[in-house]
Each structure stands twice: as structure tokens, then as C-alpha cells.
């Protein structure tokens, strides 16, 4: 059965987004701006996409988030203060996703140009050394931690723990690659492609990443285990090689000096 064309979907979702923005403006007249993220902002919604809308306020007290159905379209409306939106510039966990999202964010209401100013700033922003170091330190730590859980699962023949640990490792490897390559993540839809095409990446990423993450299915737990362990080993060494000489914090430097082979990695 042939569904609606892309142009029909785009028109339908744009109309629903505009209705949602009008509703938010009526209910909350003091909003500083309204924007929409995701596939609707990019002009590529699918037939079952949702609308991810954000209202921005200058006030300390924010309205409660809410959601509803507009016909068959699910609409989610969240709220952030201008200060919270600007805080993402210094948040290691939010930075790369927020910058990527800003590239395709669609502004629906911005009477004083507040959102345009913030979006323009994102386009010119590079991560600070502090953001890079904190991001890579966190991922280095988490990869080591879950390598232990992975090996415990394998040793105890606990398939769930082995597969779960492998998936978590793959997710932390994603974040390490994002930081090492200074990637702007547009959305989950593009993450896979951006990770695999990154210049700085583990040698066997194309084999190990999909197996560890679980998006290339296999009944053989041994394959998942071996791929996840190799992904750990190669990513940890990649971080050491690419960023080790730039680390400023003494405790992170000390951790990087610890021989990985000594710990089975």
C-alpha cells in the first residue's frame, strides 16, 4: 500500500507544528520563543513521526511539559529557560548533540531574536578543552568499568549480563568517538553513519560496533563478547594515543599511565 508522499507529510506536519506553536503562545503569552527539533525541523518526517517542540522562557518558573495528539500526530511540548539553553554550551553530555540539533532547528516564534542569537552562536562554537577532557575521561572510565561487567558475564555464562555490558560499552565508545572527532550529532537517525565514518576510530569498528550494540543480531554470545572486548581495547588505546598528551588533570593523566595489558585490556 502506497503511503503519503514526502511533500504531503511535510505539509501535514508543518501545519500541526504551527497549530502547536499557536496554542503554546495563547496559553503562555510570555514565552521568549518557540522552536521545533527533529525530523519535522529537517523537513523529513515519516508517517509515524512525532513533533518535538520546545518553548523558551525568560522567567525562572517554567510551565509544565505536556503532550497530546493532533489527529494521528503526537506532539510533545517541553520548556527551557534561556539560561538552561545557554548552559548546554558548557555541558559535556549535551554539547555535541545540542550543537548538531541547532544546525537543523526550526524557529517558529522569536519576537526579540533570542533564539536566532543562540542558534548563530552554536554554529560558531567549538568544544572547550574542559568539555573534551571531561567527556573523554568519563568514557574512558565507563568503558573500563563495563569491561569488567562484560568479563564477569562471560565467565559466569550469564548471557544477559554479557550482552547488556556489550551494548553499554558500544554506547560509551560512540561518545568517545564523538568527542575525539568533534562531531555535531544531528539526530539518532544519522548517528550510526556519523560514527562509522569518523576519521579517528577503532580499527575494527565496522565489525565490532554493530555486534556489541546489538543491531547486528547473532545467537552466538561469544561473537558479541569478543567484539565488545576488542572494542574496549581499541577505544581505550585510541583515547590514550589521540588525547593522552593533552590531558591537564593529574588524576586522568595517572589513569592513562596505567598499563591496560596489566588488567586484561
Regions found by a protein language model. Name each.
Residues 1, 14-21, 42, 108-116, ...:
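Short N-terminal helix-initiation segments at or just after the protein's N-terminus
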Residues 1-49, 54-103:
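Metal-dependent nucleotidyltransferase catalytic core
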Residues 31-36, 51-56, 75-77, 107-110, ...:
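Generic hydrophobic secondary-structure signal
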Residues 49, 68, 89-93, 122-123, ...:
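Surface-exposed beta-strand edges and their flanking turn/coil or helix-capping segments
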Residues 126-265:
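Conserved nucleotidyltransferase catalytic core and NTase-mimicking acidic/glycine-rich helix/loop elements
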Amino acid at each position: 500500500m502506497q503511503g503519503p508522499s514526502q511533500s504531503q507529510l511535510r505539509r501535514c506536519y508543518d501545519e500541526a507544528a504551527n497549530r502547536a506553536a499557536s496554542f503554546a503562545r495563547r496559553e503562555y503569552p510570555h514565552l521568549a520563543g518557540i522552536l521545533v527539533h527533529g525530523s519535522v525541523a529537517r523537513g523529513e518526517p515519516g508517517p509515524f513521526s512525532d513533533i518535538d517542540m520546545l518553548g523558551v522562557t525568560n522567567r525562572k518558573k517554567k510551565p509544565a511539559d505536556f503532550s497530546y495528539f493532533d489527529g494521528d500526530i503526537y506532539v510533545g511540548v517541553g520548556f527551557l529557560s534561556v539560561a538552561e539553553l545557554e548552559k548546554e554550551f558548557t555541558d559535556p553530555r549535551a554539547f555535541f548533540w545540542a550543537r548538531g540539533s541547532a544546525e537543523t532547528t526550526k524557529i517558529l516564534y522569536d519576537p526579540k531574536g533570542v533564539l536566532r542569537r543562540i542558534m548563530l552562536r552554536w554554529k560558531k562554537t567549538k568544544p572547550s578543552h574542559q568539555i573534551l577532557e571531561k567527556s573523554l575521561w568519563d568514557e574512558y572510565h565507563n568503558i573500563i568499568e563495563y569491561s569488567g561487567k562484560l568479563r564477569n558475564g562471560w565467565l559466569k555464562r550469564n548471557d544477559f549480563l554479557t550482552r547488556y555490558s556489550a551494548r553499554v560499552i558500544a554506547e560509551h565508545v560512540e561518545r568517545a568517538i564523538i568527542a575525539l572527532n568533534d562531531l555535531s550529532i544531528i539526530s539518532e537517525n544519522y548517528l550510526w553513519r556519523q560514527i562509522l565514518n569518523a576519521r579517528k576510530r577503532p580499527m575494527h569498528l565496522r565489525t565490532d560496533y554493530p555486534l556489541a550494540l546489538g543491531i547486528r543480531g547473532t545467537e552466538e554470545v561469544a561473537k558479541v563478547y569478543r567484539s565488545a572486548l576488542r572494542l574496549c581495547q581499541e577505544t581505550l588505546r585510541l583515547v590514550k594515543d589521540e588525547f593522552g598528551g593533552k590531558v591537564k588533570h593529574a588524576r586522568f593523566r595517572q589513569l592513562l599511565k596505567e598499563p591496560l595489558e596489566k588488567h586484561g585490556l
